[in-house]
């Protein structure tokens, strides 16, 4: 029981230490979430929004299995976008 409490205290201390000592080029841990999506410099930079898509007659994998999708307006037929 004492060992568990000591481990919890140690983890909390190390987490706090990491946050305090984090190097931030903007002089501190400033409001990371204060800007709205419209105010961001490059909202298109998100990797989630930039998915590679395959053109017509290019190889594709069924979306349930893989991460290669056909471009909008096309569907993944038997291993090719049509």
Curated annotation (Swiss-Prot):
Tissue expression notes: Expressed by the venom duct.
A GO MF term: calcium channel regulator activity
Entries under InterPro entries matching the protein: Conotoxin (IPR004214)
Positions of the propeptide segment: 23-49
GO cellular component entries: extracellular region
N-terminal signal peptide: 1-22
Keywords: Calcium channel impairing toxin, Disulfide bond, Ion channel impairing toxin, Knottin, Neurotoxin, Secreted, Signal, Toxin, Voltage-gated sodium channel impairing toxin
SS bond partners: 53-71, 60-76, 70-81
Localization of this protein: Secreted
Taxonomy, superkingdom: Eukaryota
Family, similarity comment: Belongs to the conotoxin O1 superfamily.
Notes concerning its domains: The presence of a 'disulfide through disulfide knot' structurally defines this protein as a knottin. The cysteine framework is VI/VII (C-C-CC-C-C).
Role description: MuO-conotoxins are gating-modifier toxins that inhibit sodium current by trapping the domain II voltage sensor in the closed position to prevent opening of the sodium channel. This toxin inhibits rNav1.2/SCN2A (IC(50)=532 nM), rNav1.4/SCN4A (IC(50)=438 nM) and rNav1.7/SCN9A (IC(50)=345 nM). It blocks Nav channels by interacting mainly with the C-terminal part of the pore loop of domain-3. It does not bind on site 1. At small concentration, this toxin also acts as a calcium current agonist, whereas at higher doses it blocks fast-inactivating calcium current.
Protein name: Mu-conotoxin MrVIA
Source species of the chain: Conus marmoreus (Marble cone)
């Amino acid at each position: 029981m004492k060992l568990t409490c000591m481990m919890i205290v140690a983890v909390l201390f190390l987490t706090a230490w990491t946050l305090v000592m984090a190097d931030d080029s903007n002089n501190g841990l400033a409001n990371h979430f204060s800007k709205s999506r419209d105010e961001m410099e490059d909202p298109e930079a998100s990797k989630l929004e930039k998915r590679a898509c395959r053109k017509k007659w290019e190889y594709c994998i069924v979306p349930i299995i893989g991460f290669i999708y056909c471009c909008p307006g096309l569907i993944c037929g038997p291993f090719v976008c049509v």
